[in-house]
Swiss-Prot record:
Domain of life: Eukaryota
Annotated disulfide bonds: C1283-C1315, C1323-C1485, C1393-C1438
PTM-bearing positions, type Hydroxyproline: 212, 218, 230, 233, 245, 248, 251, 260, 269, 278, 281, 284, 293, 305, 314, 320, 329, 350, 356, 365, 368, 371, 395, 398, 401, 410, 416, 425, 431, 434, 440, 458, 473, 482, 497, 506, 512, 518, 530, 551, 557, 566, 581, 587, 590, 599, 605, 614, 623, 626, 632, 644, 659, 668, 671, 674
Function summary: Type II collagen is specific for cartilaginous tissues. It is essential for the normal embryonic development of the skeleton, for linear growth and for the ability of cartilage to resist compressive forces.
Domain Fibrillar collagen NC1: 1253-1487
Record note on domains: The C-terminal propeptide, also known as COLFI domain, have crucial roles in tissue growth and repair by controlling both the intracellular assembly of procollagen molecules and the extracellular assembly of collagen fibrils. It binds a calcium ion which is essential for its function.
Lineage of the organism: Eukaryota, Metazoa, Chordata, Craniata, Vertebrata
The protein, known as: Collagen alpha-1(II) chain
Sites carrying sugar chains: K190, K287, K299, K308, K374, K608, K620, K1130, N1388
Modifications after synthesis and translation: Probably 3-hydroxylated on prolines by LEPREL1. Proline residues at the third position of the tripeptide repeating unit (G-X-P) are hydroxylated in some or all of the chains. Proline residues at the second position of the tripeptide repeating unit (G-P-X) are hydroxylated in some of the chains.
Spans annotated as Nonhelical region (C-terminal): 1215-1241
Amino acid sequence: MIRLGAPQTLVLLTLLVAAVLRCHGQDVQKAGSCVQDGQRYNDKDVWKPEPCRICVCDTGTVLCDDIICEDMKDCLSPETPFGECCPICSADLPTASGQPGPKGQKGEPGDIKDIVGPKGPPGPQGPAGEQGPRGDRGDKGEKGAPGPRGRDGEPGTPGNPGPPGPPGPPGPPGLGGNFAAQMAGGFDEKAGGAQMGVMQGPMGPMGPRGPPGPAGAPGPQGFQGNPGEPGEPGVSGPMGPRGPPGPPGKPGDDGEAGKPGKSGERGPPGPQGARGFPGTPGLPGVKGHRGYPGLDGAKGEAGAPGVKGESGSPGENGSPGPMGPRGLPGERGRTGPAGAAGARGNDGQPGPAGPPGPVGPAGGPGFPGAPGAKGEAGPTGARGPEGAQGPRGEPGTPGSPGPAGAAGNPGTDGIPGAKGSAGAPGIAGAPGFPGPRGPPGPQGATGPLGPKGQTGEPGIAGFKGEQGPKGEPGPAGPQGAPGPAGEEGKRGARGEPGGAGPAGPPGERGAPGNRGFPGQDGLAGPKGAPGERGPSGLAGPKGANGDPGRPGEPGLPGARGLTGRPGDAGPQGKVGPSGAPGEDGRPGPPGPQGARGQPGVMGFPGPKGANGEPGKAGEKGLPGAPGLRGLPGKDGETGAAGPPGPAGPAGERGEQGAPGPSGFQGLPGPPGPPGEGGKPGDQGVPGEAGAPGLVGPRGERGFPGERGSPGSQGLQGARGLPGTPGTDGPKGAAGPAGPPGAQGPPGLQGMPGERGAAGIAGPKGDRGDVGEKGPEGAPGKDGGRGLTGPIGPPGPAGANGEKGEVGPPGPAGTAGARGAPGERGETGPPGPAGFAGPPGADGQPGAKGEQGEAGQKGDAGAPGPQGPSGAPGPQGPTGVTGPKGARGAQGPPGATGFPGAAGRVGPPGSNGNPGPPGPPGPSGKDGPKGARGDSGPPGRAGDPGLQGPAGPPGEKGEPGDDGPSGPDGPPGPQGLAGQRGIVGLPGQRGERGFPGLPGPSGEPGKQGAPGASGDRGPPGPVGPPGLTGPAGEPGREGSPGADGPPGRDGAAGVKGDRGETGAVGAPGAPGPPGSPGPAGPIGKQGDRGEAGAQGPMGPAGPAGARGMPGPQGPRGDKGETGEAGERGLKGHRGFTGLQGLPGPPGPSGDQGASGPAGPSGPRGPPGPVGPSGKDGANGIPGPIGPPGPRGRSGETGPAGPPGNPGPPGPPGPPGPGIDMSAFAGLGQREKGPDPLQYMRADEAAGNLRQHDAEVDATLKSLNNQIESLRSPEGSRKNPARTCRDLKLCHPEWKSGDYWIDPNQGCTLDAMKVFCNMETGETCVYPNPASVPKKNWWSSKSKDKKHIWFGETINGGFHFSYGDDNLAPNTANVQMTFLRLLSTEGSQNITYHCKNSIAYLDEAAGNLKKALLIQGSNDVEIRAEGNSRFTYTVLKDGCTKHTGKWGKTMIEYRSQKTSRLPIIDIAPMDIGGPEQEFGVDIGPVCFL
């Protein structure tokens, strides 16, 4: 045996270690690491815990072995290197290098028997052995982690067999040499190669070629060969063990829907889509009307008995039947398209084993089963690409030696090539048995390592030689007896999926799962094969000869031809009615791979199979298609909110909103009446003295000065310039009323008034010419329901009314009687797929339908059982065509053939041409209100038509979509007063008017702006008090001032009346499917549908058993139409047909019970702003606001009471004089000058420090009180006198509710009002704010007169104002003060009428029936007459009796504040039984 030299061995060892490390690197993640002596080793690590021991980590287990050293007898000076176990020979040996000798013959087998060497370390990897016999089936892998859910893949073609797994663990101990000793001991590069073992003799002459030795052990791994040609595909091998989990699938389908999003806005209808594939069958509809009988179809030829059709799509699970007997295995069906995964059902009982489906993608590993018995060897699979070294196989028994071949010329083997680069070392195979012993060769010269020599006397096992060239394969020996089982190898890495295994027996039928959710619509399934032929019917009357059919009718029977090619797809047939559910069919072909079930019951072990032959290597297959869709993932996170839904209906009236932001300045109003004089202002702070002016005219009388020494009488000075106006003085006592002045010039236009309360809608007038679009009025409040009046005689038919508003949906009425059947409508487009209903009970058998068109010729069925047949004779030659035979009698029907293979799924047909329009259907129920259309372009106004005769009133139509806006019409009547507009921008300045007549002397004007301070003049001498001068003339009117800055935004208007009901919202998201209802009663047989389209031809089925050979006749002439056979017995129930396309929608069923409320939709986007609501109720007082900013320092208060006298102090130094002006004002009642004004900054501290702390506190308190008097907050604790005061003190504040106390004094009687901070108006709310709408007054008298509501009508009342919580007369007292403090008042009221005239009597054309209004000073305010006592009408909707509610809005403004507020109203046109009214009272506003 030849020893390896150190360098070669070192190379091998290096490669071996590299391979071990590489494998180790590959497996670190896969297998567990090991711990020994506290040191952690990765899987496949090799280490030496001590010099003579070597260990390896194998998947978490430490395997150790002792190193056995080789005997070094022949070494003169063996040395053991430090840290090593075995000695090495250190003598340098010469290395002769000769030419390689010729290759020796194979030696004889040695006869070492059963000598087991010590366990060698893993040898270098041998070349790939020939494919060994198939190993036993491995244990089932452990369950892998579930992969992410993939999308439904298309069913892939089965992948090629996967590559072999990674190398297995080291094999059992080998026979033969001790390679470990060398490995463990290391190699000395200087050692010679040849002399490491037995001394080598000289090379003998080449012997004759020996007989082929027994098969050697697999050699080390060879280099990778070039890929061979792809082999023929082998027969499918048995199903391999489950492969490792596949790569993560494509992202899974989205998780189950989050909670339904809130409904989005309804999109515009899309275009009509192409015809969809049939949806899941809907729930059974109400039975339709019987259809019209179809036309007689042309009689089809009798088809050959069709092959039994493929099972139809599985029906919904029926209620579980009794467990049937185990069925025969069905034929293997083609894989159907994958359905969508249903929701997981409850675990059923284990069913009988179903036929195996095609190999699905790798599922998650199942639970490990018990190991099955070893199966028989499957047929050879296609050869996979060369894999990594497999686990060690069992050693085969040696074959018997073949006969010796003739000695070949040495040239057969060729010169050994240069040594190739080392292959990746494999783990050593088991050592082979020793070859037969060769004769000893003569001693050769020491050449380079020669080929293998003869085996010498059995010596100590040598090292393994280098791989020689591969010998030619010997003939296969007989199969040896199975060797003993090797140690169990390490589990290999998971192989790729094997080819499809042979079909297993069908599983037991599982219990039905829960109903899944409807899957996505599948593609249209293939047309099923024709069902079994029913027995013959009773003889019918002879039909007329039909037109020639598409295929020729059969002549005399020829020999059965081969199956023809598929024909073209027939035209799309119309949808037939669904048949009655069939009985359970035979087990269908396997469906697509289902979701993985729970592990089944363990099967019995199968018998062991025979070993297959090795197949050729196939090319690596493409990756398989992604697997089926997995089970639904966990619920996804809630999705983002959906898009905003459509606007919801208008909400209930909200609470009073916060005041809106200020608007822009409005345009100036028309000139108002002249204002009354302003109130006297408070006294202002005196300015500093001006420069001495020219001597002015005698001034007004001043306050008496301190008495001076009497001076001499001065001369009267000239009239001085007017001084700057002082600040407002305190309020003077009211003087006697002066005579009314002459009418002044018209004032500037006032701001627009507050928006009045919304009026009631007037009755619909006659349709006028189209007006220009008027301003939109505020919607009125809905009236209370009136009493039902007696039915009047029918009036002349009015013009068609405008379309009314959509009423709220009424409650569902009871179901009406069934109407007469309408004419058959056009088939509607298929409705959306409903949820699958439970199968109905079996219906009564329908009448026999007309014979359908002939289907494509089915594949040949197996011949029916005829009588016992004789042995088939040889086939005769084709005979001559015989004459046409006489018509034979109809033969008995043949037995049912087997099902043909299913045809392919046809492509969806193109959309058919639209059919002709059907006759108009009966009118449908009112649909929901359509979405608002886009505004169309304005049409041009048509000429007014002649007035037609009035038609009868139409029924209330369904609200149409909003039409396009028409062109602007002529201006309509005056709309309701709008909300008070925002103050407009100032208009252009008008020209100066002529001076008016002198007015009465006004009250002092408002405080002017203080003038600029003049320089301080020298004090004049104190003069004596002068006499009172005559009153000066009034100055002439000043020129208009510069334009003021724009005013602030107007107050938010009073909330308008409740808007009309909004349009019906978009339908909510569909509720979850209801639980299935109970099965309905058996419906009547539906009418026969029209023939379905001919499906495409299925692929050719396997050829049937050969029929009895007949003489092959040429095709016979067309036979005559056969007579109808007798009516046969009822056939077996056919298999369930394929699912038909959806039928036309049935008539709507009765309204179902309301489903459970769906989940609330998402909050819709804010709806369009509704019309203003009604006046809100007074809000509750807000919380006390935060403390205001610190007020200004108050002026010094009056001196406090004198303190107790202190003890006399020591005399101080003479002090400076005190500035007496600091205390000059303390004793006066009016405000004196601000002492702090005269202090210098450096004096203040010194002077103030002397004040007593008590005085300081008092001053501070007084200061705060004075500040609150000077600048009230409008809170309950610190009310203002009027809103105008608040506006002056806090111009930045917004309009809203504030507290005022016009009579000042105690604040407990303050009242809450609305302050319009744009105008300064104070508005007091009425209480109550409305008079209910009803019939208040009945009178038989024909004479109509005004009836005062508060005074005369039973239940009437005078209108009152202010808070509920004020004492009864408090509001009146406060109102009296408020009138005195104001110069103008205004108020709106709205009169709601039904058959009552409010202002203009349209019939009479006059105002005689107009309302009267009573002011608070009992003055009557009328519709006509003196303009001071007349009201204005903003909108008049009560001009005639229409039987509907209308409203008239009235406004009264006056500068005589004593006339407001309005306290009573007197309608005239009331008293009849159908005459009703109500009143909305607006707030009264004073300015």
